[in-house]
């Protein structure tokens, strides 16, 4: 991705985007199939997303460049989506 003449790899958001898509799909599948174990797995997956966010925050605070900032911003939105998958999973567990 090119931003203001700089080439950005957006490595953290690229890495986590696949996990977040898996979480969203998994939470929907858990709901449709009334699958508590799948719901629990979604909750566990969130730890990886959160840890990646903390790592990216640490790196962005030290590098302060446009690419790190953009990667962090996208990652924060992805982390929020992952949190919604966790909320769905938690409701499934309570419902069943």
Language model: regions and residue ranges:
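Cytosolic, long alpha-helical scaffolding segments
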Residues: 1-96
């Amino acid at each position: 991705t090119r931003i203001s003449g700089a080439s950005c790899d957006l490595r953290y958001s690229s890495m986590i985007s696949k996990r977040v898509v898996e979480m969203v799909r998994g939470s929907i599948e858990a709901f449709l199939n009334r699958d508590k174990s799948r719901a629990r797995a979604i909750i566990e997956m969130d730890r990886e997303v959160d840890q990646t966010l903390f790592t990216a925050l640490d790196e962005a605070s030290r590098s302060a460049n446009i690419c790190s900032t953009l990667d962090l911003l996208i990652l924060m939105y992805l982390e929020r989506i992952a949190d919604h998958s966790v909320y769905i999973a938690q409701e499934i567990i309570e419902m069943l």
